[in-house]
Amino acid sequence: MKINKTNAARLLDKAKITYELIPYEVDEKDLSAVHVAASLGENIEQVFKTLVLHGDKSGYFVCVIPGEHEVDLKLAAKASGNKKCDLIPMKELLPLTGYIRGGCSPIGMKKHFPTYIHETCRHFPYIYISAGVRGLQIKTAPEDLIHEAKAEICVLFAE
């Protein structure tokens, strides 16, 4: 089966970053990272989801967290220099990022937004992120993702 390269994959190629494109079966009724991890047969702690938020001071920013967790809005606000923040409404995701729910990658959005990745990403030799479409994940080293996304490592949920 031929896998079409996504914008995120092309940007990783351009940056000479090693990665794998891993397809999985999409369930339109369950777009969760938990489903993705189960489909891949991988540890949910290594399958990260991308969330877009809006802060009261900084505007839009991106949080990347392990799939089974929910972002702590107070911690996200603190990390991003805001007093408060909230997830953006779903209807804003595509026009803002170029991505849809279940296929939002921290790499290759229409515009670069400040990006924050939960610190546990460094516990693993590789993690999974969306490749920018439903049904396709990027498997890459966390340090490569941090570098390419120009991300800061921080705590985004209480463990």
Residue ranges and their predicted role:
Residues 1-159:
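Extended, low-hydrophobicity, polar/charged segments
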